[in-house]
């Protein structure tokens, strides 16, 4: 696992955007062989999305031959609801880049058969050849996507009940009213994320420090699902200084030293 420690949120967002753009460009994608990107929502990736939009406007990266699969979606929210992840992705990213609408895949939380929707999502990922780079955020409790503590580390796309902590955390997007937050969601599994060729996790702020410490220094456990990244051959966490507050001094210095040429 690589841990990239940047000074602040803006710096880590730019690093992540540059990394994603470099991977797309190196793949030289075509309509027949597109680059497949896994996309998160939430506040963590917003800076990266803004930086990627700028790189796209500057002609430094194109999304014409990029196919995306989003991590998750609430169950029961209309697609055009202001807090649906469909709305989030188009408003904050897709509307501002040269991606083709037919290349965007987001789980349908209003499907008649939710289990079939999840199975078909996995099938679509497999048929295109898997995900080249899965980007993700991390919750204060170490969850990735909606894989809450206790989730199977080999799990695939499925329906999940959200924990009280997550409902409270997400209520900030629903007028701070926990009763407005959907109680279930469709989410890719930990195994789905780990099946990607590369995984890039964004971790920022002191409130994520404990999760980062478990991800890097702790054992692999279902109670901190991000810890499963230790098993991935090409896992990267890019974080800011505040997120490193719980790391041992030796761990911090090790990653600062080994990655100094890449910062």
UniProtKB/Swiss-Prot annotation:
Active site, UniProt feature: 72 (proton acceptor), 141 (for ring-opening step), 143 (proton acceptor), 148 (for ring-opening step)
Control of this protein's activity: Allosterically activated by N-acetylglucosamine 6-phosphate (GlcNAc6P).
CDD domains (UniProt xref): GlcN6P_deaminase
One function term, GO molecular function aspect: glucosamine-6-phosphate deaminase activity
InterPro entries in the record: Glc/Gal-6P_isomerase, Glucosamine6P_isomerase, Glucosamine6P_isomerase_CS, NagB/RpiA_transferase-like
UniProt superkingdom: Bacteria
Coiled-coil parts of chain: none
UniProt keyword annotations, A-Z: Allosteric enzyme, Carbohydrate metabolism, Hydrolase
Gene Ontology cellular component terms for the protein in this record: cytoplasm
EC class name: hydrolase
Annotated site (Part of the allosteric site): 151, 158, 160-161, 254
Enzymatic reactions: alpha-D-glucosamine 6-phosphate + H2O = beta-D-fructose 6-phosphate + NH4(+)
Pathway field: Amino-sugar metabolism; N-acetylneuraminate degradation; D-fructose 6-phosphate from N-acetylneuraminate: step 5/5
Keyword Hydrolase: yes
PROSITE patterns recorded: GLC_GALNAC_ISOMERASE
GO process terms (BP): carbohydrate metabolic process; glucosamine catabolic process; N-acetylglucosamine catabolic process; N-acetylneuraminate catabolic process
EC number: 3.5.99.6
Family: Belongs to the glucosamine/galactosamine-6-phosphate isomerase family. NagB subfamily.
Role played: Catalyzes the reversible isomerization-deamination of glucosamine 6-phosphate (GlcN6P) to form fructose 6-phosphate (Fru6P) and ammonium ion.
Protein's recorded name: Glucosamine-6-phosphate deaminase
């Amino acid at each position: 696992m690589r841990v990239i420690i940047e000074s602040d949120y803006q710096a880590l967002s730019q690093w992540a955007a540059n990394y994603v753009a470099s991977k797309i460009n190196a793949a030289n994608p075509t309509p027949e062989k597109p680059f497949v990107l896994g996309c998160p929502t939430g506040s963590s990736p917003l800076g990266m999305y803004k930086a990627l939009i700028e790189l796209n406007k500057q002609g430094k990266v194109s999304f014409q031959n990029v196919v995306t699969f989003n991590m998750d979606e609430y169950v029961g929210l209309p697609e055009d609801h202001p807090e649906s992840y469909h709305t989030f992705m188009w408003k904050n990213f897709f509307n501002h880049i040269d991606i083709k609408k037919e290349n965007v895949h987001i789980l349908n939380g209003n499907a008649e058969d939710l289990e079939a929707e999840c199975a078909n999502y996995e099938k679509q990922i497999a048929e295109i050849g898997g995900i080249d780079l899965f980007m993700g955020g991390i919750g204060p409790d170490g969850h990735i996507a909606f894989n809450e503590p206790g989730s199977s580390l080999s799990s695939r796309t499925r329906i999940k009940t959200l924990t009280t902590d997550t409902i409270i955390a997400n209520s900030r997007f629903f007028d701070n009213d926990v009763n407005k937050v959907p109680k279930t969601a469709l989410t890719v599994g930990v195994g789905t994320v780990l099946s990607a060729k590369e995984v890039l996790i964004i971790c920022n702020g002191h409130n994520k420090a404990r999760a980062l410490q478990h991800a890097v220094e702790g054992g692999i456990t279902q109670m901190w699902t991000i810890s499963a990244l230790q098993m991935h051959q090409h896992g990267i966490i890019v974080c800011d200084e505040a997120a490193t507050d719980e790391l041992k001094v030796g761990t911090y210095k090790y990653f600062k030293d080994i990655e100094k040429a890449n910062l």
